[in-house]
C-alpha cells in the first residue's frame, strides 16, 4: 500500500468516526451547527473517496471541495461563537455565512498557484487560531481539558508537517495524517462537549 493511499484511508476512517461522534453527541446541541458539521465531514469523506478512486479531473474537484470544507469550518466557528455568547451580545445570524465569500473569490485565484497556496495556508492557520481562542476562552467548560489541548496540538503539528516539512523530512508525509486524524477526533469530541455543556446551562 502506497503512503498516499494509506493516508487517504486513515483520514476516511477518521471522518467516519467524527461523523458518528457528531451525530450521537450533538443531540442536545444547536441543530444548525450539527447540520453544518455533518455536511463538512461528508465533504471530507467525498474527497478521500475521489482520491482513492483516482477519477478524471480529481485534482480540480478535490481542490474545490477543500475550499468548501474550509468555508464550512469557518461557518461552524461563527455559529459556535454566536451560540456561546449571551443573547444580548450575539451578532445577526446572517453574519455566520460571510465565509461563503471564500468560495466566491476562489475562481479568481485558481491560476495563481503561489498566491493561492499562501492564502489557503493563512485560512487554515486562521481557523486553527480561532479554535485555540475558543477552547482557551472556554477551557473551564471542559471536563477533560487534556483532550482539548491534545487535539489542538495535533492539528498544529499536522499543519507544520504538511506545509513546511513534507519536502524536507522523510517521515513528515507519514506523520501528518496521523496527527491530523488525532486532531480531528479529539477536537470534534471536545467541540461537541463544549456546545452540549453550554446548551444544558
Protein language model features and the residues they cover:
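Hydrophobic alpha-helical transmembrane segments of multi-pass membrane proteins
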Residues: 8-22, 32-55, 63-71, 148-166
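Hydrophobic transmembrane alpha-helical segments in integral membrane proteins
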Residues: 1-18, 107-124, 173-174
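Juxtamembrane "helix-exit" motif on the non-cytosolic side of transmembrane helices
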Residues: 49-58, 104-116, 160-171
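C-terminal transmembrane-bundle signature of multipass membrane proteins
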Residues: 131-201
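Membrane-proximal helix-loop-helix units in multi-pass membrane proteins
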Residues: 77-133
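Internal transmembrane alpha-helix with an interfacial aromatic "cap," most often the third helix
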Residues: 17-27, 50-95, 132-136, 191-195
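Non-cytosolic membrane-interface motifs at loop->transmembrane helix junctions
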Residues: 57-66, 114-124, 170-180
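Membrane-interfacial loop-to-transmembrane alpha-helix junctions, especially the N-terminal start
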Residues: 27-41, 86-97, 141-152, 200-201
Amino acid at each position: 500500500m502506497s503512503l498516499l493511499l494509506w493516508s487517504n484511508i486513515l483520514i476516511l476512517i477518521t471522518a467516519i468516526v467524527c461523523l458518528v461522534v457528531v451525530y450521537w453527541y450533538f443531540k442536545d446541541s444547536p441543530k444548525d451547527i450539527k447540520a453544518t458539521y455533518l455536511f463538512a465531514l461528508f465533504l471530507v469523506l467525498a474527497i478521500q473517496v475521489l482520491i482513492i478512486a483516482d477519477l478524471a479531473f480529481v485534482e480540480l474537484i478535490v481542490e474545490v471541495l477543500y475550499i468548501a470544507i474550509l468555508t464550512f469550518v469557518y461557518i461552524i466557528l461563527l455559529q459556535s461563537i454566536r451560540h456561546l455568547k449571551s443573547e444580548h451580545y450575539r451578532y445577526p445570524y446572517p453574519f455566520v455565512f460571510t465565509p461563503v465569500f471564500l468560495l466566491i473569490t476562489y475562481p479568481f485565484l485558481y491560476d495563481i498557484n503561489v498566491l493561492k497556496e499562501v492564502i489557503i495556508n493563512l485560512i487554515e492557520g486562521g481557523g486553527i487560531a480561532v479554535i485555540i481562542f475558543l477552547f482557551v476562552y472556554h477551557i473551564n467548560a471542559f471536563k477533560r481539558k487534556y483532550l482539548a489541548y491534545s487535539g489542538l496540538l495535533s492539528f498544529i503539528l499536522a499543519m507544520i508537517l504538511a506545509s513546511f516539512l513534507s519536502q524536507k523530512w522523510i517521515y513528515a508525509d507519514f506523520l501528518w495524517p496521523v496527527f491530523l486524524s488525532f486532531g480531528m477526533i479529539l477536537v470534534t469530541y471536545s467541540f461537541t462537549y463544549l456546545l452540549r455543556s453550554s446548551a444544558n446551562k
